[in-house]
From Swiss-Prot:
Highest taxon in the source lineage: Bacteria
Gene Ontology molecular function: ATP binding; glycerol kinase activity
Positions bound to sn-glycerol 3-phosphate: T11, R81, E82, Y133, D242
Family of the protein in this entry: Belongs to the FGGY kinase family.
Organism field: Rhodospirillum rubrum (strain ATCC 11170 / ATH 1.1.1 / DSM 467 / LMG 4362 / NCIMB 8255 / S1)
Gene encoding the protein: glpK
Keyword line: ATP-binding, Glycerol metabolism, Kinase, Nucleotide-binding, Transferase
Top-rank EC class of the record's enzyme: transferase
Name the record gives this protein: Glycerol kinase
Binding site for ADP: T11, R15, T264, G307, G408, N412
PROSITE patterns for this protein: FGGY_KINASES_2
InterPro entries: ATPase_NBD, Carb_kinase_FGGY, Carb_kinase_FGGY_CS, FGGY_C, FGGY_N, Glycerol_kin
Pathway: Polyol metabolism; glycerol degradation via glycerol kinase pathway; sn-glycerol 3-phosphate from glycerol: step 1/1
Protein role: Key enzyme in the regulation of glycerol uptake and metabolism. Catalyzes the phosphorylation of glycerol to yield sn-glycerol 3-phosphate.
């Protein structure tokens, strides 16, 4: 029986899952990743830890599955997107901590570039906005703050990659420097219509072309692991950014299908087919996936803080000891008593794009309880999702009939039901909620010939539970109106 190994490198942890050829998880391993916060709004990772942890969990998953390397048909890689890694080609060692997608240190530069009128060019070529979220200004910051690094980059001595590119480089012993199209599309340097690195964008952000990896499809033969890593070489045949892998894992291969993933942040992607559509409502246009050289596009809404709000209750306030407690707390009260949490810890994402916004809990009274604050943290995920779905409906002209959800938060039944209630559409939770890893494994299977076509991948999806809206429309709109007012008080551009 062929097995597939998915390595899923995320913002707060690295995990690996062994799947069988029917898409069922056989064994998994996970290790938390330390985050560093060296300045206000700054977020970094140790790139060496990313590599070492990813290798360790892959080995552990194989051990737990009792599967030898020669029985693994292929490896699929998926990763936190936009996070920028810079390393020395000769040694394979990082020259700076990885700057994480959440990092806002380049907000002033982004404002300056917008004021100079560059955003129209960026939107036309990349489908993105000028924002610290994306990789280009992170790379530029590293080069500008160490003149030696800029000189070495221009001389071709350094390499840039998003996390999947970094892992591919390390797994192959430096033999392959490549990035998949979905990750390249998140850098602000890649023209997603022409499918190439763009000279105008490289000049705008002052990024030397010598840094850049070769761009490949999401499925194909990219290289193989060094024999010593797992006991035998394993082909690496699938790569995608985490949200794109989740789209594959959710079987969203038809125009109009939509998925939303709830992890540290939350990300909704709507399949819009093979025609580029520029958003009029502050969404991103991005690659859903690229197979056999053919691009499929998506509208994306990015929420910077989802599960991180619950982590803050646990680790920051120490109000709870585990994320699972939030469901019990939320169910213990009938409502939040007018309390809203706007979790803009690192600014607001779509559709506001306000890097200066900061989080707030509004509507507090002497009677506000921990249960109500916990419920407000969970409700915020529904309100933010409603923001995105309304913008998508305005751009596409149609409202989706169902929302496929995944990620750690959707194990919480209360969250899924509130999502259905506040959006007014059905919410579908799959049997395998680790759909990011499943999508990476499926792409690896496609690249290795285990699956013949994307249609075979869609057959891997099975529904666990359907949540339908129960909330009266008047109540839904009243709650959402309160959210809109809360955001208005937090967002710097709306005050």
């Amino acid at each position: 029986m062929p097995f597939l190994l998915a390595i899923d490198q995320g913002t707060t942890s690295s995990r690996a899952i062994v799947f069988d050829h029917e898409g069922q998880p056989i064994a998994r391993a996970q290790k938390d990743l330390v985050q560093y916060f060296p300045g206000d709004g700054w977020v970094e990772h140790d790139a060496t830890a990313i590599w070492e942890d990813s290798l360790a969990v892959a080995r552990e998953a194989l051990d737990r599955a009792d599967v030898a390397a020669h029985a693994i048909s292929a490896i699929g890689l998926t990763n936190q997107r936009e996070t920028a890694v810079l390393w020395e080609r000769a040694s394979g060692q990082p020259v700076h901590n990885a700057i994480v997608w959440q990092d806002r240190r380049t907000a002033a530069l982004c404002r300056e570039l917008k004021a100079q009128g560059h955003e129209a060019l960026v939107r036309r070529k990349t489908g993105l906005l000028i924002d610290p979220y994306f990789s280009a200004t992170k790379i530029g910051w590293m080069l500008d703050h160490d003149p030696v690094l800029r000189r070495r980059a221009e001389a071709g001595e350094l390499a840039f990659g998003t996390v999947e590119s970094w892992l591919l480089y390390k797994l192959t012993g430096g033999a392959v420097h490549a990035s998949d199209a979905t990750n390249a599309a998140r850098t602000l340097l890649f023209d997603i219509r022409a499918n190439r690195w763009d000279e105008d964008l490289l000049a705008l952000f002052r990024i030397p072309a010598a840094l850049l990896p070769r761009v490949v499809d999401n499925a194909g033969r990219f290289g193989e692991t060094l024999p010593g890593l797992f006991g035998a070489p394993i082909p690496i045949t699938g790569m995608a950014g985490d949200q794109h892998a989740a789209m594959v894992g959710q079987g969203c291969f038809t125009r109009g299908m939509i998925k939303s993933t709830y992890g540290t942040g939350a990300f909704a992607l709507l399949n819009i087919g093979q025609t580029f559509v520029e958003s009029r409502n502050q969404l991103l246009t991005t690659l859903a996936y690229r197979l056999n050289g053919q691009s499929t596009y998506a509208l994306e809404g990015s929420i910077f803080v989802a599960g991180a709000a619950v982590q803050w209750l646990r680790d920051g306030l120490r109000a709870i000891s585990s994320a699972a407690e939030t469901q019990v707390l939320a169910e213990a009260v009938a409502d939040t008593g007018g309390c809203y949490m706007v979790p803009a810890f690192t600014g607001l994402g779509a559709p506001y794009w306000d890097p200066e916004a900061r989080g707030a809990i509004l509507g507090l009274t002497r009677d506000t309880s921990l249960e109500q604050v916990a419920r407000a943290a969970l409700e915020a995920q529904g309100y933010q999702t409603r923001d995105l779905l309304d913008a998508m409906a305005a751009d596409s002209g149609t409202k989706p009939l169902a929302l496929r959800v995944d990620g750690g938060m959707v194990a919480n039944d209360w969250v899924c039901q509130f999502l259905a209630d506040i959006t007014g559409i059905a919410v579908e939770r799959p049997r395998v909620i680790e759909t990011t890893a499943l999508g990476a494994a499926a792409l690896a299977g496609l690249g290795a010939g285990v699956f013949a076509s994307p249609a075979d991948l869609g057959g891997q999806w099975h529904r666990d539970r359907l949540f339908t809206p129960h909330m009266p429309a008047s109540r839904r709109e009243s709650l959402y109106a309160g959210w809109v007012q809360a955001v208005r008080r937090v967002a710097s551009d709306l005050r």
